[in-house]
């Protein structure tokens, strides 16, 4: 089974376009079981419906670094909109590249909201202020244990830096007890 999407929502933060995959797989051992003419018709209607909406270019472009970041589509467009609003889109590629280290050294927590935001905010801080000079509040509290345990223990150097820069001690307490 292969997941596909319709242009103009396919690509960057979504699955590949159904027509592109259909064409690429024609004549191979695997074919998409779709009526391509109906799909193209639906794509034209969808494209017309979406013409009233702003779709950021990075949401439509394939970015090969995304699987290593990892940055889910909703977080990507929210964060790039913030960068666009502040004239910082020139830092986009650096931030996406910086995320891999942030995820790895932060304990590999699941990259969904709010953790995907923590990752991006920390990667952004690392790019703008220098590596590990300023900790994003959510990321720092996560590596210090305030939201529970990450799948892998965060890097001890990052725990130490976050504790020092945020003036917070690491904790192993139950997050429910901490936030009661």
Q: Which residues does each predicted region cover?
A:
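Terminal or standalone catalytic/regulatory effector modules within metabolic enzymes
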Residues: 60-65, 70-180
